[in-house]
A protein has these predicted regions:
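N-terminal low-complexity, Pro/Thr-rich disordered segments
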Residues: 15-16, 28-53, 387, 606-609
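Short, solvent-exposed aromatic-acidic interface loops
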Residues: 364-377, 537-540
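Acidic, metal/ion-coordinating pockets
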Residues: 2-3, 7, 37-41, 47-371, ...
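Acidic, glycine-rich low-complexity/disordered segments
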Residues: 383-401
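Glycine-rich phosphate/diphosphate-binding loops and the adjacent beta-loop-alpha structural elements
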Residues: 398-417
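Feature captures C-terminal
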Residues: 55-60, 64, 70, 80, ...
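Short amphipathic
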Residues: 365-366, 402-404, 484-486
Length: 609
């Protein structure tokens, strides 16, 4: 699919023939004025209908997703978005930070009497030290100040289990760490977390509220929140213990009917599952190849099956930016949006509500992703929040761990083999190679566990090239315990093939490997055949299917997480230190102020294109 730039679109996009289609789909009848580059479906913040008691009322829906506790502007490429230039080429621009997100959202709300703010999950979990050190209490506090109205849960809301998620909702001090601010009890979220497809195994009852109805002056919009059904495959077993995750489509359709029976006909689904547009530019017109043709991935199949009773889908999980239409089961285009990640974008959508039918008019759309640029004034309340928590974290966060010669990209790398992935895998292998530490011969690291880059430019007063504890924690925030297990060569080979088959067939997960472990990935082939037979070697020798190897990996992978059941077959397990501890130990052992760690060559996986 061609990545065709379409910017500053000023023509109205008609979503349905005829003005009477009001029971399905999303959004706006008013023609807004053209906005800045990146505005889509008429773009901008324009609203044209009666803001009072008239029949048609424009409701502003502001949305975002996958914040992951990034209160401060993300560093390096993790803090950038791609956009089209006038000549059709692309450029990267800095974005993100809740001080700026708050300003942008507050400015966007001005002049909009009816405005609701919603999110699609993963707002907490896998967070940088500033939030993660305090079990994400700082992020929930920031979201309260952002006036978030409602969010779905995502998979990362379950990182610390259902009990901790309940604490995020209801408040209270941490059961082991206690209260972080002396004499002040954590109040919890002012907004509801929705988890319609998450039930308790023993009772079958919903873990949290399945839906929420926003209401103002008689205007009512229902929100249904779900996370991906595959959450147990990408969260530790302890995190989802005692829970059942249901089918997204079946769940949304079930509660859409319930809302309809309650007289709520305007419905938005908050879905923590996503897709991938044909271009990584946030202002790409993903409908340019045809409605629904410029985006692929799990969300497209979900959107095609969700009941026409649902008027729009706000999505997440894949950290991608898109504002698309995907045909609903009746063949009518319906809006599907996602706002990248880490607070770098927000989506502004207009929903035109008909007071007589109580439904959303789907004759036209006005929706756009907007960059959370850093050229606006910082929100003072967010600055104070960050300063207060930074002061508490400083004694730990500012400790030097090592030195780097240049940026070492992890999350910001689009390659299968990431330079920072090599460093992490080497750290895990080296830390667990001694006989008394496990005798590891190689290490495997899941790419999703690499949450950021190591950036050479100083983030504070530590000096360029210094890696602080706060920065290493941001890269490895889960503090998973390391495991060393016996794996047969056959199961090791099977695990590599599972990178590109089975649960990972449509969204590959390429394991990062330690030095000495090599193989070839042929992307011209399909499924498991992409891992070339006979190419898998350890220190130049072909892996013997009948032989046993000692393999280091984090406990999540050792449990078969991320779609790697072959890794769960390991035996003779030894539990070592945390992944963060071995990472920091490696940085300390392999770098100094005069001899910083160089960027690895990333030449262990040969890719055939």
């Amino acid at each position: 699919m061609a990545a065709t730039p379409r910017k500053n679109r000023t023509a109205r996009r008609l979503l349905a023939a005829g003005a009477g289609l009001v029971t399905v789909g999303a959004l706006v009848a008013a023609m807004p004025s053209a906005g800045a580059a990146g505005d889509r479906f008429g773009g901008g913040h324009g609203h044209g209908h009666d803001e009072g008691k008239g029949r048609l009322v424009d409701v502003q829906l502001l949305s975002f997703n996958d914040l992951h506790g990034n209160l401060e502007p993300p560093a390096g490429s993790s803090g950038q978005v791609t956009r089209f230039k006038a000549d059709g080429t692309t450029e990267k621009v800095d974005a993100g930070g809740v001080e700026y997100l708050a300003t942008h959202l507050r400015q966007a709300r001005k002049g909009n009497r009816y405005s609701v703010t919603a999110a699609a999950g993963d707002l907490i979990g896998a967070s940088p030290l500033l939030s993660g050190l305090f079990h994400d209490e700082p992020t929930v506090g920031a979201l309260n100040k952002l006036d978030l109205d409602v969010t779905s849960v995502g998979n990362h809301e379950f990182d610390e289990g259902a009990v901790e998620l309940a604490r995020m909702q209801n408040g209270g001090c941490h059961p082991t760490a206690g209260c972080f601010v002396k004499g002040k009890k954590f109040k919890g979220a002012d907004f509801p977390y929705l988890a319609a497809n998450v039930t308790k195994e023993k009772t079958g009852k919903p873990l949290l509220d399945p839906y929420f109805v926003w209401e103002k002056d008689g205007v009512r919009i229902g929100f249904i929140g779900v996370t991906l059904e595959g959450t147990p495959n990408i969260v530790t077993a302890e995190g989802v213990k005692g829970l059942k995750f249901g089918d997204e489509v079946e769940t949304i359709n079930k509660y859409a009917k319930i809302l309809e029976r309650k007289g709520v006909k305007s419905i938005v689904a908050l879905v923590h599952e996503g897709g991938a547009p044909a271009s990584d530019a946030y202002d790409y017109d993903c409908d340019s190849p045809g409605p629904g043709d410029g985006i692929s991935g799990p969300i497209t199949e979900i959107a095609k099956k969700v009941s026409p009773q649902v008027d729009a889908l706000v999505t997440g999980h894949t950290h991608q930016a898109y504002v698309c239409t995907v045909p609903d089961p009746a063949g009518k285009p319906r809006l599907v949006t996602s706002a990248s990640s880490y607070g770098k974008l927000y989506t502004d959508t207009t929903l035109t509500y008909d007071r007589r039918t109580k439904d959303i008019v789907r004759t036209a759309v006005a929706s756009a992703n907007h960059v959370v640029s850093r050229d606006v004034p910082k929100a003072a309340d967010m600055t104070k929040l960050i300063q207060d928590w930074t002061a508490l974290a400083a004694p730990i966060a500012n400790r030097p761990q090592g030195w780097i010669a240049a940026d070492i990209n992890g999350r910001g790398s689009t390659a299968y083999e990431k330079p920072l992935g090599d460093v992490i895998a080497d750290a895990q292998w080296e830390g667990l190679a001694p006989a008394d530490k496990g005798g590891a011969q190689l290490a495997l690291m899941n790419p999703g566990g690499i949450r950021s880059d190591l950036v050479h430019k100083a983030s504070g007063a530590e000096g360029d090239g210094v890696v602080t504890y706060g920065e290493s924690f941001t890269v490895q925030p889960f503090t998973n315990m390391m495991n060393v297990v016996d794996l047969t060569g056959a199961n090791l080979i099977a695990a590599l093939k599972q990178q590109v088959s089975g649960a990972n067939l449509n969204s590959v997960k390429i394991l990062q490997v330690s030095k000495g472990f090599t193989y070839t990935l042929d992307t011209t082939k399909t499924g498991a055949d992409r891992v070339v037979d006979g190419s898998i070697k350890l220190n130049g020798e072909a892996i013997d299917p009948a032989k046993t190897y000692r393999v280091a990996m984090n406990e999540f992978l050792a449990g078969g997480g991320d779609g790697f059941p072959a890794l769960a077959t390991g035996t003779n397990k030894l539990v070592g230190p945390s992944d963060l501890d071995v990472f920091n130990a490696y940085l300390a052992a392999h770098s100094s102020a005069t001899s910083p760690l160089a960027v690895p060559a990333a030449d262990r996986i040969t890719v055939v294109k």
